[in-house]
Amino acid sequence: MSTNAELFDRACRSIPGGVNSPVRAFRSVGGTPRFIQRAQGPYVWDAEGKQYIDYVGSWGPAILGHAHPEVVRAVQEAAVHGLSFGAPTEAEVELAEMLIARLPSLEQVRLVSSGTEATMTAIRLARGATGRHKIIKFEGCYHGHSDSLLVKAGSGLLTFGNPSSAGVPPEFVAHTLTLEFNNLAVVDAAFSQHGAEIACVIVEPVAGNMNLIKPAEGFLAGLRELCTRHGAVLIFDEVMTGFRIGPQGVQGLTGVRPDLTTLAKVIGGGMPVGAFGGRADLMTHIAPLGGVYQAGTLSGNPVAVAAGLATMRLIGEPGFYERLSAQTARLAQGLQERARAAGVPFSADAIGGMFGLYFGDRVPASFAEVSACDTEAFKRFFHAMLERGIHFAPSAFEAGFVSATHDDAVIDATLEAAEQVFATLRA
């Protein structure tokens, strides 16, 4: 049996950095990544056979817990009939109809294979429909790794301390205006100066890629009003929050309706599915109806769609989100209480099945505030919890995720470990 260290050494010889997505490399926390061999419910097991309570959840998709039997069965049954057709299927129509039925802002939807594809195409669609070039995004919000969006971004870029990517020519981002999240005044000023040139505003309505940051009161409604007034397209990037924090995402909780929405993660149930959709008059600009081109060999893949359909059915059951939210809140509150009892500067927040942990005196509301949190304290906390079998994201700038299988016993075990760790941090 290979150890995690042996596997990482082997991986580094064939894969850049030893990983296929940067944050997995443990670079911001130090140490050796855990190579996961299997997962079930709220647990993962590494290459050395050690079991962990998992709060990464594949970075959001595992809302039902890992390897849910009904999702696995759906994938197996679909795979028997063929892995990919490159042609329309009834299942993809059913998934599209299900998404439209659940999100009031969706009138039509196009399936893709990732969140990056969804956001990249939504931006292209907004530009094509409006005939404008400039876009507004926000510091610390991550919308995938397309060139025009890799400016002061969150997720792995923020984790490694360089929120803008090398290899992106300045002219590619010349039309990208990057503003402070939760600051409506700067958005108003940008529209006052460039209103006739702005194609869209794209925002994580609850930011989950600079840890977890909720929108300030009136921020999303203000974006809606400004976009409507200036004829710009409002895009909610709900790749992470869509069906993760509630049955209608952030737009359901706030009542703010975007023009376009991007989705991924939960809607694929752990398989590669993304989507973008919204107003029908905008969606008619997409090929083959209009001149905005988008295509994908594996878009609407039948096996991935089967996983998505099974997941969407299960999360639609009565009481699902009430239970999920209660467990997530219990975790966040329990961590906060134990840190306070130990005298450790620490805050926690939660919404739906997402939570944020911050080594600071208050819950941050912006990129600047989350960047000021104590990352060294987080590193010590992360490794001490990992030693005790609790698997959090290996970054101080990523949200955490609770699944439907994180029951009271799992939460209690996590809080017991945290109580021990906070005592060592105080010392």
Curated annotation (Swiss-Prot):
EC number(s) reported in the record: 5.4.3.8
Annotated pathway: Porphyrin-containing compound metabolism; protoporphyrin-IX biosynthesis; 5-aminolevulinate from L-glutamyl-tRNA(Glu): step 2/2
Subcellular location(s) of the protein: Cytoplasm
Keyword annotations from UniProtKB, A to Z: Cytoplasm, Isomerase, Porphyrin biosynthesis, Pyridoxal phosphate
Cofactor(s) annotated in UniProt: pyridoxal 5'-phosphate
Main location group: cytoplasm
A GO molecular-function descriptor: transaminase activity
Single Gene Ontology BP annotation: protoporphyrinogen IX biosynthetic process
Catalytic reactions on record: (S)-4-amino-5-oxopentanoate = 5-aminolevulinate
Modified residues (N6-(pyridoxal phosphate)lysine): K265
Domain of life: Bacteria
GO CC annotations, alphabetized: cytoplasm
HAMAP family in the record: HemL_aminotrans_3 (MF_00375)
PANTHER family, alphabetized: GLUTAMATE-1-SEMIALDEHYDE 2,1-AMINOMUTASE, GLUTAMATE-1-SEMIALDEHYDE 2,1-AMINOMUTASE 1, CHLOROPLASTIC-RELATED
Assembly description: Homodimer.
Official protein name in the record: Glutamate-1-semialdehyde 2,1-aminomutase
Species of origin: Bordetella pertussis (strain Tohama I / ATCC BAA-589 / NCTC 13251)
